[in-house]
């Protein structure tokens, strides 16, 4: 199913994506998901060099077929469209852990040639970040941190993020 086929899909409060030509419908992201994505994106934007930009929910079309909406993206600054693979896509795990959904999307990012893929678990007690790097067409895990342990990577640019800060505003006091 080509990405353009999503155009007639109603705005029913669900996310509709085509990571490998198969329609995946999931509930709209909840507050923990959106807060973690927004704080992550802000941290990325503060750390990224001038020639790059970090942004939320790109709704990118990744080749033929395939449309996915990563939670955060880092790409080179250019015109109004993303015509080459971004340097980084980040996905926040849904509450149901959506593993089939993430496997489809991860495979789509691999095929599209996205060099860096991050996975965020917004668990309030022990949030975590995992980084994957594209090597010979497949992702290999390169970094992992949880809780208050700093997550450090050098690609696509040096950045340090403490996973617990992604959900700090969600914790009850």
Features from the language model and the residues they span:
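Gly/Pro/Ser/Thr-rich low-complexity, intrinsically disordered segments predominantly at protein N-termini
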Residues: 1-173
